[in-house]
Amino acid sequence: MLMHEKLMAGQFFDLKTDRKPLMHHHQYQHHQQQPLHHLPHSQLPVQGSLGLPKMDLYTAYAYQQQLLGAALSQQQQQQQQQQQHQQLQQQHTSSAEVLDLSRRCDSVETPRKTPSPYQTSYSYGSGSPSASPTSNLLYAAQMQQQQHQQQQQQQQQQQQLASLYPAFYYSNIKQEQATPTAAPPKVTPTANLLQTFAAASAAAAAAAAASSTNSPRPASNASTMQIDVLENPLSPAVEATTPTTSSSGEAGKNTRPFKAFPRDPLVIAANFAATDVLLDNPRVERYTEYRKRVLEQIRSSNGGSRTVTNPKMRRTNSRSGSVNEGSSSNNNSESEDRAAAEESSDCDSQAGNFESKSATSSSSNLANATAANSGISSGSQVKDAAYYERRRKNNAAAKKSRDRRRIKEDEIAIRAAYLERQNIELLCQIDALKVQLAAFTSAKVTTA
């Protein structure tokens, strides 16, 4: 057993016997001398190792470091010699090669003073053509051989170091093998946590979006306001908030600015209308009476309807109803006429087909032409009917929105007129009170 092996094995300090392990080492070698005499001369240990027990701990460690340094220097010299030998072989092979015109100009042996545009920072100034990136494919086999030789040299170095310094070297190898295996489990839990967090956040976002789509906005509820709700402003809040089913489908749409107003016309007219409702009930009753009278006047002037489609044409409900009935009857009659025309055209086309079998070719051509014209006319009639139906629905929706806007405008105008009347009445009361106060003070002064 050599000194450096005892150093790494930790046999220099014997805590149980409290003796110096160098003496044990000397006795061990003395007992081992008899079997060593029978060994051949090549297997005998070095005589310098016999003097190691006489050395101190620090001197033995220094001697061990010298041995390691000498071995490493010898290996480096051998590597340098091998590299020089390989470079010389490559130069001889490149000089002996025939001129190949397929090679690019940047693979020339002599480096240029000005670098070519094909050369990179790696290929410029390289001594061999294998160093250029363009000719790496040609020398792939040589590169593989060089890598294989380097791997063999590294393995030899590891074996030599292991023979010189076994305990320290093998412990390092075990640690290096343990570190990469322990690294992946540290990464995977964090990745799993990130995945679960991303899934949870996505689920929360989806739930929030679903709740926002299902819950109607208060602004969209204003679009479902009915006329009778405006005509009865003192209805309870439960009735005002009932039509939420139709507004749930319109939650995704953007409301118009005028439709975003609240339902209560008192709040539309003035900001302090709500305070009037809470504080002064008689004033609210007077306002409702005034509003009813104004609405009756509007209906009488508009012919019994709340709004007028065209102010220049005063139509009553009866006339509008008769007109609507007449239009519906006309539409029905037109549809019946169209169906009859289609049937007649079909009959004519069939009759023409039957006659064409017995008649001449001219009559068959005329029948085909009439059938084609009748088909085109029927298709155009269907298209016209669909177009007029779309126009009718669009006009009805436009009239509905226009009527709602005019109702709101009327409510605001009614509230403004009422507030003006109240202002005039209050001013008159203030003037009367001032006169009474002046008369009272003058009478009091005269009596005093």
Curated annotation (Swiss-Prot):
Name used for this protein in its record: Protein giant
Biased composition (Polar residues): 298-310
Region ranges (Disordered): 23-47, 83-134, 238-259, 298-363
Basic motif: annotated segments: 390-406
Compartments reported by the entry: Nucleus
Alphabetical keyword list: Developmental protein, DNA-binding, Nucleus, Phosphoprotein, Repressor, Transcription, Transcription regulation
Keyword Phosphoprotein found: yes
